[in-house]
Amino acid sequence: MDQENQDDSGTGDLAELRKEIDKLDLRLVDLLNERARVVVRVGAAKQVDGTPVYAPDRESAVLKRICELNGGPLPNRTLQAIYREMMSGSFALERPLQIGYLGPQGSFSHLAAQRKFGSSVEYRPLADIRAVFDEVARCHCDMGMVPIENSSGGGVIDTLDGFLETHVHMCGEVVLEIHHNLLANCTAEEIKAVASKPEVFAQCRQWLATSLPNIEQTPVASSSRAAEMAAQQKGLAAIGSDLAAELYGLKVIFENIEDNSNNMTRFLVIARQPAKRTGNDKTAVMFSTAHRVGALVDVLNVFSRHGINLTNIDSRPSRRRNWEYFFFVDAEGHFEDPNFAEALAEARHHCGELHVLGSFPRATEPI
């Protein structure tokens, strides 16, 4: 009898708590729609002013503010994910955005784009990185998502070349934790071969040698293509993302098979418009140096004298003249900051060419 009373009491408490949640949900829905009505007015004002739908500085300010307001128990990362999805819905109310990315569907570029822009924008898988640059430059896509460097594999050459050959701006960055999973439509014992990109095989080398030592490895152009093949061929597994498993109807046989648990890739958002200052920015600069001894050192010393921290440097052949190189530098600050602008003006005296590729809000943690 006592047990029955306890059960009834517990059920009653749960029922009351659920009623309380239902009331809160009612208020939330009303507030979300009230916010959406204001968003529609914002969209109309942007059309009059010719302001882009997506404003990286505004996104950064909103996400920073909600974290400052957050008293818990929800972690900041959860609140940011909720607000990114709300922003995605806002974009759709103003004007549907089209985001190009390195495809096929289910690629890590696709996953990075979804984490950044949510589920209410349109996504276009493109054949290669150059196509992402071209479609943004031609106004066929509002923005593009391209990988720039991996913590294990280094810089992405095709992305650097894209900046040499097209006129687009960097307006954002995304840091994504890369977790590789073994995907298949069969059991682990039935796997006869594994498909993925060569770079992915390299990132999972130790696990594959230990767990699947005698299984054939089939290199393909992308991890998404591998998932597509695995969905069609029983006995063929793929190494790919959770998103690829969902899109292609595959089972996750083993999770997190990467050798380096701290494996991350940095992606760039590219657009036709530059981003405004936020106070916590990075700037990417591309330059070629004069043909004399010490020219590169002279350029780097300019940034040092102005107290500007360089976070990355890379180089690529210019493709215009043999043995001429373009250097790519990431630096802390915005190109419109007075000190940064002075440094750029001084650096130009030591360069054959110098181009600011864009300033954008810094990604302080993985998305």
Model-derived segments and spans:
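Domain-level signature for soluble enzymes in the chorismate/prephenate branch of the shikimate pathway
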Residues: 1-367
